[in-house]
């Protein structure tokens, strides 16, 4: 629990050290929810530090203890998709999250983004539209993804509208600004 407290206070290095020690204490009869959460947080921290291979190992361990940990499934799937790695696995994990929580805009956005990475743009458009309908935060990332998806389906007017909304919502990405200026999709 010390590691969780450190993580919540953004003391990520200390939290990672604590979790690594804690993982050494895991027994076969340990509480699977707690162990899964330990590994999930480790995965998040390792990803933030740019240690993606280690992060993915932590997520794999997390899911061995609790295969339906939706937060870990979503994060793992999204991080794989951003790297354009193992998209079939990412899609399977993400699909589990939208089945568990069909109106969760974050999960819908992740699933749409994976479909985008797989060049399944029309399907991606269906899920990003659902994400936007359910997005109470009006996330700049979701809006940028929507713009990217619409651009790839040939609807530049809609793409520009979403990119502009993303920019107005506080997204400061230099790539986003180029997309708007050049009126075309640009990969990150």
What is each of the regions a protein language model found here?
Residues 10, 50, 84-85, 119, ...:
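Residue-level detector of the short coil/turn that links helix A to helix B
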Residues 4, 44, 78-79, 113, ...:
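Residue-level recognition of tetratricopeptide repeat
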Residues 7, 40, 47, 81-82, ...:
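Position-specific recognition of the canonical hydrophobic site in helix A of tetratricopeptide repeat
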Residues 1, 41, 75, 110, ...:
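Canonical tetratricopeptide repeat
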Residues 27, 67, 102, 136-137, ...:
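Short coil turns that delineate tetratricopeptide repeat
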Residues 32, 38, 72, 107, ...:
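TPR alpha-solenoid repeat register
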């Amino acid at each position: 629990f010390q590691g969780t407290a450190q993580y919540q206070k953004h003391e990520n290095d200390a939290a990672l050290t604590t979790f690594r020690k804690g993982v050494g204490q895991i027994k076969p009869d340990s509480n699977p929810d707690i162990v899964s959460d330990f590994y999930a947080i480790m995965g998040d921290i390792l990803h933030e530090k740019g240690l993606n291979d280690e992060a993915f190992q932590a997520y794999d361990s997390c899911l061995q203890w609790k295969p339906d940990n939706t937060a870990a499934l979503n994060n793992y799937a999204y991080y794989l998709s951003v790297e354009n790695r193992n998209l079939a696995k990412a899609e399977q994990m993400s699909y589990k999250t939208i089945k568990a929580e069909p109106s969760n805009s974050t999960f819908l956005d992740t699933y749409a983004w994976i479909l985008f990475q797989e060049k399944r743009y029309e399907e991606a458009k269906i899920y990003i539209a659902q994400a936007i309908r359910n997005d109470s935060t009006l996330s700049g990332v979701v809006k940028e993804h929507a713009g990217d998806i619409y651009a790839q389906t040939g609807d530049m007017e809609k793409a520009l509208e979403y990119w502009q909304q993303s920019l107005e919502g506080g997204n400061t990405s230099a790539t986003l600004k180029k997309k708007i200026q050049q009126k075309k999709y640009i990969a990150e």
